[in-house]
Amino acid sequence: LYETIDQGNCEFKSLNEDIATVADDGTVTATGNGSTFIKVYNKQNDCYARVKVQVNGEQGRTQAKIVGGWNYFVALKSNGEVWTWGYNGYGQLGMSDKINRLKPTKTSIFDSKDENQKIYAIDVAAGAYHTVVLKSDGTVWTTGYNGYGQLGDGTTDNQVDFIKVEGIPEKVVAVSANYYTSYALTENGNVYGWGYNYYGQLGNNSSSTAYVPVKMQKVSNIIQISAGQNYVTMLDADGTVWSVGYNENGQFGLNNTNNYYLPQKMKNEEGTGVLKNIKKVSAGTIHTLALSEDGIAYAVGYNGYGQLGIGNNRSKYLPTKMIDDSGEVVKNIKNVEANGYSSIVSVKPSSITDSEENTTKTAGIYVTGYNNYGQLFTKNATNRNTLIKVQEDKNIITMASTKNISYQTSAIADDLGLV
């Protein structure tokens, strides 16, 4: 890593040693499948950087992923194919029609059995009724509802086939979407957005709808993005969290409910400084989760259904640690997903043996929040306001829920490819 930098002036740290480890000289060794970041601290210049490491295994081209739109799902397989199912009233399934699909169906994005196809999908995102796909050549493709320009083609015409988004002058490495806005993260750490912008969620100091990609202001070192309802939260390479757009439920963690047209940094629990050492962020409808490097999850924003997992239903304007039903902070968390008005976290096996003196949580999937149809896998329809275990550890690699709150459905997938 960073061959042009004096190695003696750098410190390296893997944010998930279950996927990759890093030696003092920067040598990376794969230890499992998945993606993580190597944190690099340059002592000479007192600055941080993070390098993404993705271990796909012998057969995989990319990391599998599931995302949910309004009554539909999009699945990215490890072989680079994109499959969709569910509601298709606007062509969001990318099937050249508007016919609903009752089971997963392969799109035309990539066919792993066609030896002539070399460019495959590496990321997917879903808005309310539109789908965004990132291909391995760094291009972005969209389909579905386009009433606010969220397809990025300069029009408001809906599409039933994937179309290429033009106007992003850098290679894209990740995409995100929610409701009527789309985002692209580039390899240089810049963020571009297009679509609905009434609350300033494009971060360009404007509230005007953008029908083609516009560059977000104030941020230039972003490594991960996650879009909520009319806002987006972003992870900086230095481990801090930025957000922009709609904040009327305090989901930015700024101890206020002001909307912002330019990105703002999340505060710490006490509100006295900036929240630091974060390795992943996830935006729900109007709440945000942030996972720290030491495996603790922070939640902030709307909490009417208990989705913050803090033991009550009061909204929080500063980030607060998530707890279990005994009131203990849940530790050793390896992944978090904020979905609609609920939250899902994955706890990895602890190196500490449980005993009468130690109540370290066992590995598995823990949930909290809105559960009117049992979408939290609890075998009942009772809302939760603390994290409760619902699934034994099976190395879950992706988790998602549809965006329709009244009839929400959730899905998880493990490293064996089972959904």
Where are these regions (language model features)?
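Short glycine/serine- and acidic-residue-enriched loop/turn motifs that recur at repeat junctions
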Residues: L76, W83-K103, T143-D161, Y192-V212, ...
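Short coil/turn segments that connect the beta-strands within blades of beta-propeller domains
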Residues: A64, N71, G80, A128-Y129, ...
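Conserved beta-strand position repeated across blades of beta-propeller domains
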Residues: V67, A75, A125, V133, ...
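Conserved core positions of repeat-based scaffolds
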Residues: Y72-A75, T84, H130-V133, T142, ...
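An edge-strand/N-cap motif at the start of beta-rich repeat modules
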Residues: N56-G89, K98, I365-V367, I396, ...
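Short glycine-/Asp-/Thr-/Trp-enriched loop segments that recur within the blades
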Residues: S112-I119, V175, G271-K276, G327-K331, ...
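Extracytoplasmic soluble-region selector
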Residues: L1-G60
